[in-house]
Amino acid sequence: MRKITAVLMALALALSLFACGGVPVQDETPGSDIQQGTVILPKPQEDNEGGDSHNGEYPSAQDPLPQKPGDTKKPEEPDKAEDGKNPGKNEDNAQTPAEDPKQEENNNNNNGDNATTPSDTKVPSGEYRAVWISYLELGGMLTGKTAGQFRSNIGAAYDNVKNLGCNTVIVHVRPFGDALYDSDYFPSSYLITGTEGDNLPFDPLKIMVEEAHNRGLTFEAWLNPYRVRARTGKALCSDNPAQKYINSGSDAVYQTANGGIFYNPGSREAIDLIVNGVREIVRNYDVDAIHFDDYFYATTDSSIDSALYAANGGGKSLAAWRRQNVNTMVREVYAAVKAEKQSVRFGISPQGNTKANYDTLYADVATWLGNAGYVDYICPQIYYGFNNATCPYSSVLKEFNGMIKVSGIDLYVGLAAYKIGNEDTYAGTSGKYEWQQNSDLLSRMVTEARGARHYKGYCLYSYSSVIMPASGVKAQVQAELTALSKIL
């Protein structure tokens, strides 16, 4: 009966996520340059680790969504998929969110939190304009290269970003429980030499920060805190802490049915490792921000932490306890960042489906945005068109804007540039062809977001989608970028 129930829950969730737009998958056959002055770099590295850098609508690691040709975003990674609201006492003694994700929004319709009127849509001063550069794109620039070659490649990528009118780069530095920098906690990434744990021939992060700052770009270090492997992939090196935990039978990691390996949010050892790893980056490198992706719990399977829950659940439901674990990590990371350098910011990019965030990834976004001491900004992946049947852009924008209840938290909107020119398979009949039939969606989305009270900027996913688009969508990508440039 338990298996039948689990299957039914997975099917229901999958249908919900499909309706919200699917998951973006990195295009591995980029076309030629899209605009004069664009520098062409090596094509994105083939993904051998279980999906692309982002995951907007993630069901369960045990029941991955079937991937369809042309669909975007990886089902393997638990990237952005949480939030809703929890009735009753909040597990962290923080502000109690409303039960219905829409309720909090509706309760605040008169306080200006959700205002998006045309009169408010002027260009904000210092607007944040960012691009995500994932490990897939870094692989082609970095693997097997000399320090000089990598410096040239990443510099060219940054020049391309600046040509888009952007001022910020969000670059992967720990995609899989590894390090693209000199670390005392995590092994060097296979992206550097091709083998995890090799001695560093040079320090990629040092170069990435220097080249960004040389161009006046803000540099954000992008980490996936829990993910070690999203599915069966490259072997872990013997010095990888996750491998040591596996060898010892520790509950600091868990493995999923599809071969994924993740740090266990309920483990004190795992939390300390994540926090220390962030502290190390902020202390040793001149990064401007720490950026977490949407990978939190990779599965709803109760067996992955049953012993920890029995020992530490404290009478909470499993779901409430899991949300508390993630909240604890987020709060401690924020404190560690500020203790090292008050000026460094900490933000998270959850997926746009707030119910999936809350119920499946156990990411309590409402608590993060309703209380001080969790984040400096939120950048939801609002990877939906205006006509999406279940999660229309405007509604999701208002929902996240309305969640922010304390001053000092900024709202950035993550936009699905990877969908330009493609069929939005799971957007429903009303939104299925929206990204093919329009060439001004990005500009309209930014214009509308500027009317939201807490809005401060946007981020495009992904670098290769706008700089090296497939030949079949190249003209439409250029049209979208031209329309966007007119409102900057």
Protein language model features and the residues they cover:
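Substrate-binding cleft of secreted/luminal carbohydrate-active enzymes
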Residues: 372-392, 399-488
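Catalytic domains of carbohydrate-active enzymes, especially glycoside hydrolases
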Residues: 152-179, 284-289, 373-377, 455-456
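Aromatic- and glycine-enriched glycan-recognition loops and surfaces
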Residues: 145-164, 191-215, 276, 324-329
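Active-site-adjacent "subsite" loops/lids of carbohydrate-active enzymes
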Residues: 122-151, 220-221, 226-284, 429-434
